[in-house]
Amino acid sequence: MEVIAFVGSSGSGKSHRAIGVAHQYHCDAIIDDGLLIQGSKILGGTSAKSEQNRVQAVKRAIFYEDSHAAEVREALARSSIRRILIIATSDRMINKITARLVLPDPLKTIYITDIASKQEIKKAHESRLRYGKHIVPVPTVELKQHFSGFFANLPYNIFSKNKNERRESRSIVRPAFSYYGTILISDYVIEDIVNQADGGIRD
């Protein structure tokens, strides 16, 4: 199985662009925030956006729990996936995910700054800060089985000027950990959590 990495800061619009990047690089599936997604189906995993706090969400996204990692490894083994897109906030986070899922190093790494303008990234960050909304690259009807938070699914692309542009392959959600104000966790803190998790994980 081959791996393509997609890296960008938290809230920069990675999940919004994930399906397009996956198609461009001929990826059969996506790993995003603890979920293994193929087409419009979730093959395995648990969404990090279902966690009650941001620290637990980061641990979920890197498959910190052995049972979570094992479930997704088994789902990968049962699948016919040949190339997979892994989404993360840093190269180190990519490495941790591939280690936990026993996947090879990425053939290529795409950075959000390679495919999105500074203005587009700023707009995505502002949307995250203002509304606390997150995008999951899977239809709402499928995600409802795996997510218990608030759904704010819109019938159009919030990043497009064309309100007639439908995005039925994505869901817009508000995780439980974003209900209570706008407490933020920076990418530096995410990196610290990933680093500290090394001590509790056996690759």
Enumerate the language-model features and the residues they cover.
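Glycine-rich phosphate-binding P-loop
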Residues: 2-22
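Conserved residues at beta->alpha junctions
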Residues: 8, 87-89, 185
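Short amphipathic alpha-helical segments
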Residues: 13, 17, 93, 186-193
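Signal for well-folded cores of large energy- and translation-related assemblies
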Residues: 26, 77, 102, 194, ...
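Conserved nucleotide-sensing/catalytic segment adjacent to the nucleotide-binding pocket
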Residues: 28-85
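C-terminal accessory "lid"/substrate-recognition subdomains
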Residues: 110-202
